[in-house]
């Protein structure tokens, strides 16, 4: 039934992680099940120089479809305080990584480098200050160069919040 009715989850969300216990001893106190914590796991792995592996091609994982009736107003959690707090704990919006940001894939029972694509190349350039130089400021600058309209909108929103 999963093969017939199921659909692949979008790359922004990751639900399963396998890692040595010693890797994430400094994990912030995230609200698990809300946005941000899974993205931080990918970011943290890349920042620490660890292999971050996408197992999607080799591992079939079933994620149950559900609604959000258990949340206030039955709305998705993306605009709820717990999600905003998760993003803050993660270090801000630039640390929200997704499957595009992994550096290996588990495919045909072998670890392989992520195949080359221009999208991946430019994303690696964009995140270079975050994962190699460990500079959030330069990460923000690079984000602004690659996404000027989004960066401008974020800037305008931050000014509105201050007023």
Where are these predicted regions, by residue range?
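Conserved catalytic core of nucleotide-sugar-dependent glycosyltransferases
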Residues: 1-43
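C-terminal catalytic/acceptor-binding lobe
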Residues: 31-162
């Amino acid at each position: 039934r999963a093969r017939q009715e199921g659909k692949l989850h979008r790359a922004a969300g990751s639900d399963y992680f396998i890692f040595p216990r010693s890797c994430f001893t400094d994990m912030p106190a995230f609200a698990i099940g809300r946005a941000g914590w899974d993205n931080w796991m990918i970011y943290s792995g890349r920042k620490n120089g660890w292999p971050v592996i996408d197992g999607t091609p080799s591992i079939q994982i079933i994620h149950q479809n559900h609604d959000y009736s258990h949340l206030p107003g039955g709305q998705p959690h993306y605009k709820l305080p717990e999600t905003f707090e998760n993003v803050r704990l993660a270090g801000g919006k630039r640390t929200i990584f997704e499957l595009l940001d992994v550096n290996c894939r588990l495919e045909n029972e072998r670890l392989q480098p992520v195949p080359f694509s221009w999208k991946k190349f430019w994303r690696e350039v964009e995140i270079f200050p975050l994962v190699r130089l460990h500079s959030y400021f330069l990460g923000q600058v690079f984000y602004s160069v690659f996404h000027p309209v989004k960066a401008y909108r974020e800037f305008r929103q931050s000014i509105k919040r201050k007023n």
